[in-house]
């Protein structure tokens, strides 16, 4: 199986930036500890502080599916779903 790379972008509502950032930071450590997680990083745009980007690399789609069903992932989604304007997830494969 090939690695799965994910770029997940969340745009926090103006008055929810600190809350969304704290929730996003809290999921990183738990995700790093999951089997199949090769990389899990959280970034914040310089020119738009309400935009957060996760960059993830997983060993396989099976590992991604398992991650998406963990308690910490589901709690994160429930915490931020009403506090973001956008949550966009792109799955990719490295080609070069």
PLM segments and residue spans:
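Glycine-rich beta-strand-turn "strand-cap" elements at beta-sheet edges
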Residues: 2, 42-48, 77-96
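Localized chelating/binding microdomains
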Residues: 25, 54, 85
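Beta-strand elements of well-folded, non-transmembrane domains
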Residues: 12-14
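Short beta->alpha connector loops
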Residues: 70-71, 96
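Short amphipathic alpha-helical segments
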Residues: 16-38, 72-76, 80
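Short, well-ordered beta-strand segments in beta-rich or mixed alpha/beta enzyme
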Residues: 4-10, 41-68, 90
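N-terminal hydrophobic or amphipathic segments with adjacent small-residue motifs
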Residues: 2-4, 9, 25, 30
